[in-house]
Amino acid sequence: HTTLNADFEGGYGGRTRNGDLDYKEKRLAEGITFGEGDYYSRDDYDLHETYFQGTIGFDHKFDDKGHQLTGSFYLKYGGNAMEYFQSDLFNKNNEREKGHRAWEDEHRWTVRGNLDYIYPYSKTGRLEGGYQYFSYLEDGDYTMHFWDPQKKEFYNRDDIYNTFYFQHGINSVYAIVADSYKSFDFQAGVRGEHTHRVLRSSIPGKDRTYNKFEFFPSLHLGYTFPKEHKLLASYSRRITRPELFFMEPYITYRDFYSAEIGNPDIRSEYINSFELNYKKNIGEHTVSATVFHRSRKDKIERLRVPYEAGVTLDSMANVGHDYSTGIELSGQVQLTRWWNVNLNGSLYHYQVKNQYKTG
């Protein structure tokens, strides 16, 4: 039995936001005030695009015992995508003292595809395997205009203008085997991923190409004791990839006191997680305790440094490794048929080993 499905959509969409901030500024040097005033800021943000997207898929069932093959393909195009930001700083006389306008004009492609196979080889066991693909592409440019208080007009910042191209693709295959025997059950899996990333910019020295193949194993073991006591042990290795704006190598301004710049050399975070869980059902109530240890390599954090007078510059960096070890306790009490109470608590030790060096 085979089922096919398709869905197509197109339209125009976006979102906006605005904000107002009141400032009272006072500048001192060696205890002497040299600048003071009241200001208010008006910020506006707009993001819109014309988009077309579609999904096609199928589901083939070989029998009614869970033996099946499924697949899908998704494509989205965002054209004439414009991300616009403006900010103006006025004094108490309603005169503009600072201002900027920023345009990020681009088109975007998103592609996802998957093929998944499940084979129940016995009443309790199954094999799973599949292939997945993901790709995201942005191509566009970034422009900024700043306010000139002497000429009372905006001017283009040629030193900030930037063209960019970003493509991120992930090919992955995975396999899982799961089974149970009497009171024992297990699930073991492995995922192989090839990551391809291209970053191109008109800023000299900021082009990057990245290719890497990696494995991510996981293992889950469980044993059920008499009287509904259950013990679970698990291990997994995971990855957290940096967001695109973490890597964009050009300066953007969020307001007049905060600027940001991406780090094209930022690396992914890798997490190794070990857990041992005990669970007990007492009638309709449940109690559980989990002992865990988690380590993270190449921890990503936001760093802030001075940039210009009164302006800070934020960027992202891999600052080192962190570790957390502890216990989590939880309980669920079913007071009535329609009312239950959940209680949760944790106690852990957290450690960071900072390896980031500033030059």
Positions of predicted regions on the chain:
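Outer membrane beta-barrel strand-and-loop segments of large Gram-negative receptors
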Residues: 101, 110-114, 157-162, 263, ...
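Residues on the lipid-exposed face of transmembrane beta-strands in outer-membrane beta-barrel proteins
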Residues: 1, 10, 54-60, 113-119, ...
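Outer-membrane beta-barrel transmembrane domain signature of Gram-negative proteins
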Residues: 100-187, 222-226, 330, 357
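Transmembrane beta-strands of outer-membrane beta-barrel pores
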Residues: 10-16, 60, 75-81, 133-137, ...
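Surface-exposed extracellular loop regions of Gram-negative outer-membrane beta-barrel proteins
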Residues: 1-4, 10-28, 38-40, 52-56, 196-198, 227-273, 293-317, ...
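Repeated loop/turn-to-beta-strand initiation elements of outer-membrane beta-barrel proteins
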Residues: 2-4, 64-69, 124-127, 183-186, ...
